[in-house]
């Protein structure tokens, strides 16, 4: 069994725990590969065990950090590798275990006492070209000038769904329903569902409301506004776009896979949402 290890780079506790995990696996005879960016911030791993995330070819990834660490993994890895996530972030909607449970969780993984939780992702086409990372949480179309609204139309499966004047538009997965989409007034959606959430950001007037559409839907966005806009994917990738382009968003053929030890969803999500608000 071969493992990849990725840690949050701005917390020494996460980096030290990553080294303990690395040593724990190596002593027991398992292959362990460490993300090169983790190594740059904590250069105590063996150099022959270092690789870029884009080059990871492992059975599992152990992620030590918060949701941002998981999103970084998802944007850079080329394969759908199951992730065991250890929470060293702020809220940790995506993470599975706390730091104190790390080695208990790893032992359960080694014994096969887990299941794989698959989450849908979104693929974005700009003028028909899929050249940006898939989104685990959301794709956000944002105003390029603070204080200036975007005027756009969006279509669902070819039919006009709404014409919106707003600070932006968020298209989210159920996993991302607790993120930017919820800040835009969208609902919490069970992350196991196959749906897509569309939520305008501060629309004028407030007659434009969030909607939930089937996961097989194709969402097309065209701009009436003539100003530059910003496209943001999971808060990790940003690009300035001219308003004459067309955007299509649909479910990606790829999925995110998480190692889980319980099938309970609501206790954790309810607690995290209350902590956030």
Swiss-Prot record:
Task: Name the enzyme's class.
Answer: transferase
InterPro entries listed in its UniProt record:
ATP-NAD_kinase_N, ATP-NAD_kinase_PpnK-typ_C, NAD/diacylglycerol_kinase_sf, NADK
The residues that the entry says bind NAD(+) are 67-68, 72, 137-138, 148, 165, 167, 178-183, 202, 236
Check the record and name the Pfam families matching this protein. Answer: NAD_kinase (PF01513), NAD_kinase_C (PF20143)
Q: Which reaction does it catalyse?
A: NAD(+) + ATP = ADP + NADP(+) + H(+)
Provide the primary localization: cytoplasm
The lineage's top-level taxon is: Archaea
- Which keywords does this Swiss-Prot/TrEMBL entry list? ATP-binding, Cytoplasm, Kinase, NAD, NADP, Nucleotide-binding, Transferase
Briefly, what is this protein's role?
A: Involved in the regulation of the intracellular balance of NAD and NADP, and is a key enzyme in the biosynthesis of NADP. Catalyzes specifically the phosphorylation on 2'-hydroxyl of the adenosine moiety of NAD to yield NADP.
Task: Tell me the protein family, please.
Answer: Belongs to the NAD kinase family.
Name listed for the protein in its UniProt record: NAD kinase
Q: Which organism is it from?
A: Pyrococcus abyssi (strain GE5 / Orsay)
Q: Which gene encodes it?
A: nadK
């Amino acid at each position: 069994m071969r493992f990849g290890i990725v840690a949050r780079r701005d917390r020494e506790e996460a980096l030290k725990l990553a080294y303990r995990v690395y040593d724990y696996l190596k002593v027991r005879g398992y292959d362990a590969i460490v993300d090169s960016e983790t190594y740059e911030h904590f250069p105590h791993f063996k150099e022959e065990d270092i690789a870029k995330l884009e080059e990871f070819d492992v059975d599992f990834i152990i992620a030590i950090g918060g949701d941002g660490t998981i999103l970084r993994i998802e944007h850079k890895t080329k394969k759908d590798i199951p992730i065991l996530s250890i929470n060293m972030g702020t809220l940790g909607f995506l993470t599975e275990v706390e730091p104190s449970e790390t080695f208990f969780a790893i032992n359960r993984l080694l014994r096969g006492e887990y299941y794989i939780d698959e989450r849908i992702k979104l693929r974005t086409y700009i003028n028909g070209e899929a050249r940006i990372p898939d989104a685990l949480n959301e794709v956000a179309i944002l105003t390029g000038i603070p204080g200036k609204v975007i005027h756009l139309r969006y279509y669902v499966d070819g039919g006009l769904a709404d014409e919106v004047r707003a600070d932006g538009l968020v298209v989210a997965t159920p996993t991302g329903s607790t993120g930017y989409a919820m800040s835009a007034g969208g609902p919490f959606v069970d992350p196991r569902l196959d749906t897509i959430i569309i939520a305008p950001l501060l629309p004028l007037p407030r007659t434009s409301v969030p909607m939930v559409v089937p996961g097989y839907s194709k969402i097309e966005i065209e701009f009436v506004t003539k100003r530059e806009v910003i496209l943001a994917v999971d808060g990790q990738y940003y690009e300035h776009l001219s308003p004459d382009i067309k955007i299509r968003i649909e479910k990606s053929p790829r999925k995110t896979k998480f190692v889980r030890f319980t099938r309970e969803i609501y206790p954790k999500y309810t607690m995290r949402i209350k902590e956030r608000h």
